[in-house]
Amino acid sequence: TIFGTFNKGIKDTNRIAIIGGIATEFGISSKIPSGFDGIPVLNPLQATFYGFKDDRKTDDIDNLWSLFEAALALADNDTEEKRQEFSDAYDKVHDQYCIRWNITMGLYWIRPYTFINLDSRNRWFIADVHNMPAEFVVAVEKKLKNAPYAADYLEIRDLCKKALDTNEYEYKNF
């Protein structure tokens, strides 16, 4: 949700200003980006990953934090144990209010070389045999109809990474 405050359909100058405010507030000294090409954006009217107080359950925000931690752990060390922890957290968040494909954007934002964003543009792109191998498209096509649960999400990610690792495409990562 923090990333959603600036990764939404607003002008780049506003995105930069929001990031600058966050950096100042939290004492972050990293360079503020000046361009956002290729970064998926949320609908500005749905830029949070949780509902307002009356629309969310008491553990919704804690569940998001658990997924964040599990995603970082999986990105750092991809083991069966870490995959299970990630899957448990992801599946718990999957059915929460305000969660759909946007959860894949959030994962991409925190570790873009590990997690694939499945927004509508990427789904269209990877489901086209002109962009990805035919066997990949056949394997994932049905999994792209609805926001996937963890097992399907990880399978899509793994198959996509495998296809990109063949070096048959000019693009090499998510």
PLM feature spans:
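Short hydrophobic alpha-helical segments that form membrane-spanning helices or hydrophobic packing faces
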Residues: 103-110
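An N-terminal alpha-helical hairpin/helix-loop-helix interaction module that forms a charged
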Residues: 1-96, 112-174
